[in-house]
Structures are given as C-alpha cells and as structure tokens.
Amino acid sequence: GDLPIAFPAFMECVKMGMPIKHIRPTHVGRHPEVFAQAIAFTKAGGYIDITTSGGNYMGSAADAFVMALEEGAPIDRITFSSDGHGSMPRFDKNGEMIGLTVCKVSDNLKMLQELAGKIGLEKALLPLTRTIATALCLGNKGVIEAGKDADLLVMDKDLKPLHLFMKGRQVMKDSEVIVKGAFEE
C-alpha cells in the first residue's frame, strides 16, 4: 500500500526469525518510497506483488515491473495479482474518492499483453505462472512438465485466450467457456 513504514516492520520480523518467504507485500507500486523499499526487499530474498488493477504511481503494472527490473529486482521475486472482484476506489481530478468500482481479473491479461511487448512473452509470463506458483509453494503449478497439473492456456498471436485446460480438462474452447462453476451462468 502507501505506508512507507511497512518494509522496516517486515524486516524487523525477518530479524526476529520469520522467514522472508512468508511475508508477501502487495500494492507496492503506489508510492515511490514504498516501491524503492519493495525492490530492496526482493534483493533480500523476498517476494513482492504488483497489482494489475491500477494504482501504480509510475503508470501501469507493466511499467512498474520493468522499472523494478531496471532497479535490480530479481525477475523471479515479482508476482502480479488483480485483486479480482475486490473493490477499488474511484477518485476525481482532485484526488477525492467519489465511489467504488470492481477490480477485474482480466487486468492480468491486459498487463501480460503490454509487458510482452516490453520484455518478450517468455519473461512476461513469469509473474503469472512459475514465480507465483513457486512463491505460494504450489509445486504442481506454474510449469509444463510431466507429472505436474496440466494447466495450459492457448492464446492467439495477439495473446487473446483461445483454449484453456485445467488439470488436463478443457474448460474453454475457441474462446468460449465450456465448463462453468456453481455461480456462473
């Protein structure tokens, strides 16, 4: 978030014995001082999360990711999340909150499309695949290997979803969801 005092508190926890891998700061792109501390946190071995649903002082989440890399953050210590379906404040031109909107999971895809144009698709996929799976200790996720969950998204040349498989089961075909959950129509 916006609290510059958060990272010193995190590092005190680490000094007292808490494994740095269990501390997961998010919304780290909202304030320049917080962002600088977040980059230092990655260099100490921690993970940071950049929110794709807006709120990054330097622009988009892709801009924040590139800036973090330029400042020396290890690429395998940065994850993305959308705060999918969480509430997000809306502000007027004077910075006054005027209401709420909803964060969209699709912001992750928009960020991937933007970031791929900046650093290439292979690197752009990392914060949404291998890095987040590793950070969350999800050993069967994040990579395509024998013996792992067969989660696979097939996209077209414009990085728009065509087919999706979850644990080997096709749930999207030709850009249409074919398997729905209990709360979907």
Regions found by a protein language model. Give the residues of each.
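Proline- and acidic/polar-enriched loop/turn elements at helix boundaries
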Residues: G1, S53, L126-P127, E145, ...
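Active-site core of metal-dependent hydrolases
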Residues: G1-F91, E96-V102
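Short secondary-structure boundary/hinge segments and terminal tails
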Residues: A6, M58-G59, I132-A133, D151, ...
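Flexible, glycine-rich phosphate/dinucleotide-binding loops
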Residues: P32, Y57, S87, T134, ...
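Short C-terminal domain-edge/linker segments immediately following a structured domain
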Residues: G54-M58, F80-S82, L109-E114, K157, ...
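His/Asp/Glu-enriched, well-ordered alpha-helical/loop segment
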Residues: E70-A146, L152
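C-terminal cap of metal-dependent C-N hydrolases
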Residues: I144-E185
